[in-house]
């Protein structure tokens, strides 16, 4: 009986000392493949973000992916056979609720003109301007549109025209950078005063890629939300892709995505 009591005492002693091991008393989520704790500085400090899914960017709508018949579904009476119907699977994606309007593209031009205000970048500014002469055609009276459509406030919310594929692609890149820059400012990871000094920054302006690569030096402000921490549990003032805070790159939709959304599968 004394031996049993002695062994029980030893077991209780080990149980009581369990909390004294160099592992955190705080309950953590554990890895299903190793059993090690996530977000525990005493167990390697591997960080798992609480973010579960991507947030919706400004002006975007979520489109649930699926399968549809892409191409002509009616009889090809001309016999061209240049749009053969086929089943296509589309992954879920986000798309604008409406077309990019004149005012949105003028916002883009305004940023370029301020950021690249040195005369040496005149070609950069000119390359971004839309071709307003697309309204001109034989036997037409579209001169008022040539002069007013892009700039006049009455056409602010009309779709921008005269934009090439390259210009549209550059606009997407710019838009993604501006959205992510604002996210960092709102979280206190970039000082908002830097938004006031975009003039003349040129190649030194914020881009998502340069930020993630550590090439963009931003003066942080006080974090307004739950502070990010590093593997040692210390606060950090930079964001990684794994945090799930920044938006993915913006891009133009593929032909399949465009047709899928246009057919109303949203």
Regions found by a protein language model. Give the residues of each.
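C-terminal motif of bacterial Sec signal peptides marking the signal peptidase cleavage site
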Residues: 14-16
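Short, polar loop/linker segments at the starts of domains and inter-domain junctions
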Residues: 72-90
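Active-site microenvironments of metalloenzymes and redox enzymes
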Residues: 19, 72, 93-266
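Mature N-terminal segment immediately following signal peptide/propeptide cleavage
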Residues: 54-73
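Sec-dependent signal peptide recognition
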Residues: 2-7
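Extracytoplasmic
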Residues: 58, 65, 85, 90-92, ...
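Post-signal peptide N-terminal segment of mature Sec-exported envelope proteins
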Residues: 24-53, 61
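Bacterial lipoprotein signal-peptidase II cleavage site
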Residues: 18-24
